[in-house]
């Protein structure tokens, strides 16, 4: 194996020109990845690189996945930092494609219904990143059925996330962050497994306020 990726027991490894397993930071196809001492690609480098002054976000509508990028030393946003599972708009109310800059954030925001979402970051118009919406402005507001749709198209156009991931964007991505939404955006990390909650559970297990 040379200059190629290999998946072994659920983890990604990269073998360089000499056939040796890559460790540490490495550019592959223009992106900068980190491989542990065991050779496994690390699929969340947030703590490794620390909080950055700026990020860029891409959303892939087909995969229902979000990836956050940081810039390298030359200002190229080529370091995948984190990836999130999301829900985008249903076919009748699709999430718009294009490149946008975030104009506003809200700790809670009134959404369709009305319903209420946490850790909202506006993308464009009425389209926001937000937690799965519930019936009131408390952490105990969810419909399990709604929550369990995360990872597939389910919204009126917004990009739904679990509370942990919506909060990460809210806390870390400054206003003016560039967000690109398409059907073809590269998703360089594996799509995280969705969390399922039992009928009758009304809170998000990733919510730090529960």
Features from the language model and the residues they span:
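Short loop/turn microsegments at loop-to-beta-strand junctions
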Residues: 10, 30, 54, 64, ...
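Residue-level signal for short segments within beta-strands and strand-turn junctions
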Residues: 16, 36, 68-72, 183
């Amino acid at each position: 194996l040379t200059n190629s990726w290999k998946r072994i027991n659920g983890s990604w490894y990269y073998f360089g020109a000499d056939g040796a397993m890559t460790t540490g930071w490495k550019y592959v196809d223009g992106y900068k990845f980190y491989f542990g001492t065991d050779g496994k690609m690390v699929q969340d480098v947030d703590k490794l690189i620390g909080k950055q002054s700026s990020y860029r976000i891409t959303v892939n509508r087909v995969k229902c996945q979000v990836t956050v990028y940081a810039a390298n030393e030359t200002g190229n946003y080529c370091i995948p930092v984190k990836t999130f599972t999301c829900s985008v708009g249903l076919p009748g109310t699709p999430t718009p494609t294009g490149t946008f800059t975030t104009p506003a954030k809200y700790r809670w925001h009134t959404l369709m219904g009305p319903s209420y979402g946490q850790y909202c970051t506006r993308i464009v118009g009425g389209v926001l990143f937000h937690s799965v919406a519930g019936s009131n402005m408390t952490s105990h507001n969810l419909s399990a059925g709604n929550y369990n749709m995360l990872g597939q198209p389910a919204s009126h156009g917004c990009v739904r996330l679990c509370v942990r991931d919506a909060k990460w964007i809210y806390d870390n991505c400054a206003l003016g962050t560039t967000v690109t939404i398409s059907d073809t955006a590269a998703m360089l990390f594996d799509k995280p497994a969705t969390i399922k909650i039992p009928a009758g559970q009304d809170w998000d297990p990733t919510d730090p306020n529960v």
